[in-house]
Amino acid sequence: FGDDKNADEDIKCPKDWEGLVKFINAGYDAVKAVSEDSKVIIHLDDGSKSNKFTYFFDELAKLGAKYDVIGASYYPAWSDNNAEACKEFCNEISKKYDKDIMIMETGFNWNETRKDGYAGQLKDSDVYKDIYPPTMTGHKNFMAELFNELKSVDDNRCLGVLYWDPCMIHVEDKDNKNASLSGWAVKESDDKTDVNVVENTTLFDFDGK
């Protein structure tokens, strides 16, 4: 449930926690009815920001929300915290709620720009800009650091890491060599593919190697 659910005390929106929990529990029950062993994950962004998670999951606990795993996104481009801080966040949250945790999204630039020269979705990371440059080696070294930190989460409560997006590589448009035929979606207005904003953060280069 998520991808991702955003909520903290600063978000100005109507609060219907009871309705939200009914929705979550209905989804949980539906999943278990079909596949009892499947895990239900509630996914928030800003992994490493404990205050957002405690605000949200405290409210869910009060109302008896049912779920198995806490999911979190962690992108250095949008975080002030490094991989070690992400590990400590995992320790804190998993212990507080007695739940396994999973990093549902992460990513890092291996090239400063997309193939067309424009910036992609993930810009320079303030926390890593002087440590890991936007190169293939910098990309690999960041991922190695993150994996090693999360492997050391207490009691193996971090189940793993999902990379976003590993394979949405640049697919050249023969009619426009700077354009990519891969992207988030096809626009209804002109049947053209939307911009591929992650082609410089994949696990492959622009040529799929």
Residue ranges and their predicted role:
Residues I42-L44, F53-E84, E88-E92, K96-L122:
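Aromatic- and acid-rich polysaccharide-binding/catalytic face
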Residues F1-A65, D80-E88, N176-W184, D190:
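Active-site cleft segment of glycoside hydrolase catalytic domains centered on the general acid/base Glu
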Residues S35, G64, Y97, D154-N156:
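A structural signal for short coil/turn segments at secondary-structure junctions
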Residues E9-K12, E88, E92-K95, N111-E145, ...:
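Aromatic-rich peripheral "rim/lid" segments of glycoside hydrolase catalytic domains that contact
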Residues C13-G19, D46, S73-D80, Y128-G138:
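The substrate-binding groove and active-site-proximal loops of carbohydrate-active enzymes
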Residues F1-G2, G71, G160:
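Glycine-centered small-residue hotspots that permit tight backbone geometry or close packing
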Residues F1, L44-D46, T106, Y163-P166:
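Short, well-ordered beta-to-alpha junction loops that form the rim of enzyme active sites
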